[in-house]
Every structure is written in C-alpha cells, then in structure tokens.
Amino acid sequence: LTNSLHNLGLLLQSDFENAHIHFILRSTPSDIYIEGDEKQLSQVFLNLLKNSMQSLEGKTDGQIEVTLEVTNKLYIRLLDNGRGIPMELQEKIFVPFFTTKTEGTGIGLSLCRQIIKRHGGNFYLQESRQGKTIFVIEWPVASFILK
C-alpha cells in the first residue's frame, strides 16, 4: 500500500509541480500490505488525489498530505488545504451522480466508498472547512499485514 501511494505520488509529480502543490506521504510503519484488487485501490487513491488537486486550483501554496497510521485499525488520512466542502453539501458528496463541477459524472466518491467497503474498510469525510479537508479510509486489523 505504501509503495502504491508513493508510485502514485511519482506519477502525479509533474502535475503537483505545475499546480504548485506540495505532496507529502507519511507512513508508520513503512510497509503495509492490504489483500485486494490493486487496480481498484489505486483507482480510489488516484481519484482522491485528483479531487484534492481540483480543490487547490488557483492556490500557490497547495498541500496534499497522505498519512498512514496503525493503531487498533489502519487509518489512511488524506488532507488538503483547498477550498473545502460546504456544510450543506457534505452529506451529498457520496451520492452517486451528485456533482458541483461542470465536468465529471459525480460518481467518483461514491465509487471510492463502494470499493473500500468491498475491501472490508470504511471511507468517510472527517472534516471540511475553508482551508482544510480530511478524508479517512480505515481498515480493521485483520485486513492488512505489516512488514
């Protein structure tokens, strides 16, 4: 999982640089393995990173931070310092085909949630306000291996 996220960061590195976005990946421990469909999980993380990038459009000090933390569960937090999600829209963002964008279908976050649930995890918005949005993916201990 850590390697996949690192590779996505490398894949998007020129996009991050062109958009003045600083990408940070923090993982303790460094090697975490999840049994599942690597393509689907990569699709989830790519979608979340792209959404964060869109929320940072026009900023010159954009930051996206992905943190992997193991306690009684594996927590993956994706934080950005973008424009945030208005309170009145926060309940709607996981509804299929809901979008506020002029482009796109509005299935991204709904699809992400479905994929994570199929892999035994949970996916939710922890916090969003102007200048800070945090999405969380959590997996129970039985779903991952530390090496």
For each feature predicted by the language model, list its residue ranges.
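Detector for a conserved hydrophobic position within an alpha-helical segment of the HATPase_c
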Residues: I116-K117
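Short helix N-cap motif at coil->helix boundaries in the Bergerat
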Residues: G84-K92
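Short beta-strand/loop element within the Bergerat-fold HATPase_c
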Residues: D61-K73
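Conserved catalytic submotifs in the C-terminal HATPase_c
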Residues: E17, H22-I32, E69-T71
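Glycine-rich ATP-binding loops of the HATPase_c
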Residues: G120-Q126
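A conserved beta-strand-to-alpha-helix junction within the catalytic ATP-binding
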Residues: L1-L10, T67-L68
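Short alpha-helical Gxxx[C/S/T] motif in the catalytic ATP-binding
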Residues: G108, C112
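Conserved micro-motifs of the catalytic ATP-binding
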Residues: Y33-G36, T100
